[in-house]
Swiss-Prot record:
Provenance organism: Variola virus (isolate Human/India/Ind3/1967) (VARV)
Positions annotated to bind substrate: 113, 157-161
Cited InterPro entries: P-loop_NTPase (IPR027417), Thymidine_kinase (IPR001267), Thymidine_kinase_CS (IPR020633)
Reaction(s) catalysed by this chain's protein: thymidine + ATP = dTMP + ADP + H(+)
Protein task: Phosphorylates thymidine and thymidine analogs, such as azidothymidine (AZT). Part of the salvage pathway for pyrimidine deoxyribonucleotide synthesis.
Superkingdom of this protein's organism: Viruses
Key words of the record: ATP-binding, Disulfide bond, DNA synthesis, Kinase, Metal-binding, Nucleotide-binding, Transferase, Zinc
The protein, known as: Thymidine kinase
Keyword Transmembrane recorded: no
Lineage: Viruses, Varidnaviria, Bamfordvirae, Nucleocytoviricota, Pokkesviricetes
Chain's gene name: OPG101
Amino acid sequence: MNGGHIQLIIGPMFSGKSTELIRRVRRYQIAQYKCVTIKYSNDNRYGTGLWTHDKNNFEALEATKLCDVLEAITDFSVIGIDEGQFFPDIVEFCERMANEGKIVIVAALDGTFQRKPFNNILDLIPLSEMVVKLTAVCMKCFKEASFSKRLGTETKIEIIGGIDMYQSVCRKCYIDS
């Protein structure tokens, strides 16, 4: 075995996916692995680099397609990817990198604000050695939240935003609103 594998961190908005991604990458850095993180370049809510909703920043390459950063990451053994659901080539990229012996850690939404699947992320599940689904806290009733709900009437899937545009909600609060 070459040691390459895929770790997938999924869940709704505000569940700590990016924070967990950063935590895992930092663990590998402490162990002297060469690490790189990649963020979706259209996500510029807080500035350059990878940002958590609580304003923690981590250095990251930016791309809209992962194949565009292949040359830049050849010397790294750990690759962290944030907002994985937005990369059209996420499945092929992760499988290739893991097969080449790299550790790939992906943080992504598993469902849209309409509770429809991000199919590219679901396609990663059978290819991943580790899958963790995080929950958030329902912003209406304060129970466990597994879903993201968009505020407003916009129906386009790729609308990048934070607490101003989305809430994490439980099943009951999703259905009731």
